[in-house]
Amino acid sequence: MNALTLNARRSLALLTLAAAWSVAGSAAVAADSYDSAVQHAGRSADDVKRDSLDHPAEVLRLSGIKPGMRVVDFLAGDGYYSELLSYVVGPGGHVLMLNNPSFERFSEGGAVKRVANDRLPNVEHQVLDLNPLQWPAASLDAVFLIKVYHDLYWVDTTGVWPKVNTSAVLDNIAHALKPGGVVVIVDHSAKPGTGSTVASSLHRIDEDYARKDWESRGLKVVGKSDALRRPEDARDHVSYLPPAVGKTDRFVLVFRKP
């Protein structure tokens, strides 16, 4: 397929997607763009099933992202959030669905399938090593780290996960945000005062540590939510294994760059 044909197909896909957004928006009575994204008819049954656990409309609304924005779904896995972000930013926006090689393997082909055949033409699927991350200054409106911020502190001895230069990655994310840009963090809560010390063993991180980590890079907390709280979670089990899986207490923080 030549470049002209591919561009034509993508243009047609964008027009079709824009029309679908328009229809979905007009049909969603009293629904804002975040509810409309969650209610979009193009979403899979598996994704919809996750919504009751992840409450994505509340997280998206708290982020304040708008049509036309450039956003990153960082360590996106299979791209559950990437698709929702695609519907919110619309055909004039851009979503980078980013995985490192390990997360791409974890997705078991889900990320590739999600964007196959230009299904989401405003989503770019990229796989790259995080060492180094070199995004240009003031190039992004938002970066979402959904249950993956703790992984930047994961030290693995089995070869499954490469050691990340965490400080450099966080510095570059802050550098790449436009003034007014936001970082959205959703993660599994560790016990207060544990910092990042259980990131490897329990795949959790302390909320106060996360707040200070981003504030030290000049960002300010501008939003938080208790929508994903589970006060019954003892915070002492591995987040992705029984009995904690699907039942963890999770914090939601939004940071803005001045």
Range-by-range predicted roles:
Residues 68, 91-93, 177-183:
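Short glycine-dipeptide loop
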Residues 107-137:
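S-adenosyl-L-methionine
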Residues 133-143, 147:
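A short acidic, Gly/Pro-enriched loop at the edge of an enzyme's catalytic core
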Residues 232-258:
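Core SAM-dependent methyltransferase catalytic element
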Residues 34-62, 66:
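Class I SAM-dependent methyltransferase Rossmann-like catalytic core
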Residues 86-87, 160-179:
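A short glycine-rich, Lys/Arg-flanked "PGG" loop and its adjoining helix->strand segment in the class I
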Residues 68-77:
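Conserved class I S-adenosyl-L-methionine
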Residues 79-83:
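Glycine-rich SAM-binding Motif I of class I
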